[in-house]
């Protein structure tokens, strides 16, 4: 408990001190801030103008520092750190290209996903080398174990990449991604502690909770900084890999239900648009806008209302998971 407290306050205080200076630095470097989509909600062109991205850099520094100081650098923790940093690098390049071109499109989606899958597959293969014979087995819920066999490696890679991009899609409103990530890390860390999977994984989760809470202080509406792709892609990958390490990938889908809903809304929107355009010559939409948080914005829900209601849903689903499915 003392160690967990040290990790939490080290990450939170470090981030809380660094963010104001980092925000000032980013505003000097990029006066226009993160490029905003003109086709998005009209309010974003005003409320999110000149807000700098790349807050994920401080999240990573603040979270990894106490991990290096207080946690044991087991193979699992080292793999978590490496995968997180690889995805952070990819996100940084994407953010940099957006700022350089002053356009909301950075790296192409195909390029990002290809690189993500390569990194994730390598990471899972490394994990397989030093894991026990039960490596391919995962827990669905109470007493139900599934053995994926040879399919486990691509499945685990899919979880990591899917989680990374799901957090990225969710990061569209002030505080939305941060609140969802905090909930996911809290309950995955709790599962790791309850099942005694690895106390160091619990400390890893606590470190990120502290760092993201310090970020949330400056990211609540109206946000002073965004986490950017450097933050969302890396934090999402860390969540996905954490669920893989504690063998609770299926439960993570319920704990991170908002991430799943956000991703499905985009898939449904794009698929239905392409289908109707092919069949009728004109594309139609299921939602007013996707991801689904923008749909509710179009229905004139305020950002704070959407964020809080989504947070309530994720907490309820997480408590249900711990109570009835673990």
Swiss-Prot record:
The keyword Heme does not apply. Its main location: membrane. Its EC number is 2.7.8.13. InterPro entries: Glycosyl_transferase_4, PNAcMuramoyl-5peptid_Trfase, PNAcMuramoyl-5peptid_Trfase_CS. One of its GO terms (cellular component) is plasma membrane. It is an enzyme of class 2 (transferase). GO terms for molecular function: metal ion binding; phospho-N-acetylmuramoyl-pentapeptide-transferase activity; UDP-N-acetylmuramoyl-L-alanyl-D-glutamyl-meso-2,6-diaminopimelyl-D-alanyl-D-alanine:undecaprenyl-phosphate transferase activity. The keyword Transmembrane applies. It catalyses: UDP-N-acetyl-alpha-D-muramoyl-L-alanyl-gamma-D-glutamyl-meso-2,6-diaminopimeloyl-D-alanyl-D-alanine + di-trans,octa-cis-undecaprenyl phosphate = di-trans,octa-cis-undecaprenyl diphospho-N-acetyl-alpha-D-muramoyl-L-alanyl-D-glutamyl-meso-2,6-diaminopimeloyl-D-alanyl-D-alanine + UMP. It is a multi-pass membrane protein. One of its GO terms (biological process) is cell wall organization. Pathway: Cell wall biogenesis; peptidoglycan biosynthesis. The chain crosses the membrane at residues 2-22, 51-71, 73-93, 113-133, 143-163, 175-195, 199-219, 225-245, 250-270, 305-325. It is found in: Cell membrane. Belongs to the glycosyltransferase 4 family. MraY subfamily. This is Phospho-N-acetylmuramoyl-pentapeptide-transferase. The gene is mraY.
